Design a protein with these regions (language model features):
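Conserved SAM/AdoMet-binding glycine-rich loop
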Residues: 1-80, 91
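Short, electropositive alpha-helical surface patch
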Residues: 11-26, 78-96, 120-125, 154-163
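Hydrophobic, well-ordered secondary-structure elements that form the walls
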Residues: 29, 70, 90, 98, ...
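A structural motif corresponding to the C-terminal end of an alpha-helix
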Residues: 57-66, 93, 129-141
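Terminal RNA-binding accessory module
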Residues: 113-207
């Protein structure tokens, strides 16, 4: 489920969707910053503590749900202390994936006229820190499923050269939106597109 506001996550909401077998345990829950002071300047109507509570509720409702979010670095006024708080809280949240964006000034917005605009160099540095963090957290999350037989919706396949020989590789996603690649024959690839295939998952083979 994508682009959900934290306020949407309630016990009633979770009771309703857990009763549906068509809902995948993948949630994109809006965040933008993991520091309350920054969130306040962004005019967000939630705190990081409330966000953490919503994540806990989802994790109690589903087995190993994949929770993803968006984070903006370099919002006007974001100090080193605020960014450090964001990093610390994101480490605690341990999300499946973060889409990291550098704040970009847009004319006509309140943020564009705010004091203490952050330099491009600082934005780049902070972005790289979060990109490294999310890469590590994503790898750790996916490792939980290593050795498990996972149903994968196969979406496409490629033919690659491997030691001078053509090798066919199917690509698809699990219900948690984990990318899976599987080497097989051309015939199996053609038969499996837009179908579910059980795959013994090995993270190192899906890079």
């Amino acid at each position: 489920m994508g682009s959900l506001e934290p306020r949407v996550i309630t016990e009633e909401f979770l009771d309703g969707i857990t009763a549906l077998d068509k809902v995948c345990p993948h949630f994109h829950l809006s965040l933008q910053s993991a520091c309350n002071e920054t969130l306040k300047r962004m005019n967000r109507k939630y705190t990081i503590e409330e966000y953490m509570e919503k994540c806990d509720m989802i994790r109690k409702a589903y087995d190993r749900p994949a929770i993803a979010t968006d984070v903006i670095v370099g919002f006007p006024g974001e100090t080193e202390e605020e960014f450090a708080t964001t990093v610390a809280n994101l480490e605690k949240l341990n999300l499946y994936e973060m889409h990291v964006f550098k704040y970009s000034k847009r004319s006509g917005t309140i943020a564009a006229t705010m004091e203490h605009q952050v330099s491009d160099a600082v934005k780049e540095k902070r972005s790289n820190i979060l990109l490294e963090l999310t890469a590590n957290q994503k790898a750790a999350y996916e490792q939980q499923f290593s050795g498990e037989l996972l149903p994968v919706l196969m979406e496409e396949y490629d033919c690659i050269d491997k030691d001078g020989k053509p090798v066919y590789v199917m690509k698809g996603h699990t219900d948690r939106y984990i990318l899976v690649k599987q080497e097989t024959t051309r015939e199996v690839c053609e038969q499996s597109i837009n179908a579910f295939v059980d795959v013994l998952y090995r993270p190192e083979k899906s890079k």
